[in-house]
């Protein structure tokens, strides 16, 4: 006489490219190395590994990541150094609707340097993507902590939200919305 019935564990319907949100960090792969954009090296607070082949995200996100990294590499832009509290580039936050294919791009920087981001916007919009970029934002974050937060958000293109459908329900997803990062697994 059990109060519940155990159905077991169900896997995600897709194994790769399932995340609808990723936060990438700017940094260097080793001390004084070239600019990198990706994820923290295992066991390291400071070293950032380029993630040109991250299996967690849709290939659209990878194309955007590479475009953004190359744009700032060409301009020799600095990344934010947490201990010294100096530098410009902090994070790249990407959101992509699994059902809609709509994409939000958020470049998070400090105010310590200034760059014309219009050429970046044009390069991003010209990328051959499966989905569609519906918004590009420049988020200003001058806080000392290493979190993605907004002191100010500038919309460079489009809108700051997209819609996602989950179990027949329509959700409006914005930059800082809390939403299941694996939409399809939530439907299982």
Go through the PLM ranges and name each one.
Residues 1-188:
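Accessory RNA-recognition modules of RNA-modification enzymes
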């Amino acid at each position: 006489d059990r109060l519940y019935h155990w159905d077991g564990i169900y896997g995600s319907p897709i194994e790769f490219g399932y995340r609808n949100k990723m936060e990438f960090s700017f940094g260097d792969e080793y001390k004084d190395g070239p600019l990198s954009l990706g994820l923290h090296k295992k066991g390291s607070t400071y070293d950032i590994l380029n993630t040109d082949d991250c299996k967690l995200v849709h290939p659209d996100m990878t194309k955007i990541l590479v475009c953004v990294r190359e744009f700032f590499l060409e301009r020799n832009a600095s990344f934010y150094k947490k201990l010294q509290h100096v530098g410009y580039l902090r994070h790249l936050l990407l959101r992509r609707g699994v059902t809609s294919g709509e994409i939000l791009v958020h470049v998070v920087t400090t105010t310590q340097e200034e760059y014309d981001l219009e050429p970046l916007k044009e390069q991003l919009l010209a990328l051959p993507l499966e989905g569609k970029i519906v918004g590009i934002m420049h988020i200003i974050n001058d806080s000392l902590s290493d979190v993605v937060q907004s002191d100010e958000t500038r919309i460079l293109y489009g809108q700051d939200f997209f819609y996602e459908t989950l179990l027949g329900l329509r959700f409006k997803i914005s930059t800082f919305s809390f939403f299941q990062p694996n939409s399809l697994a939530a439907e299982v």
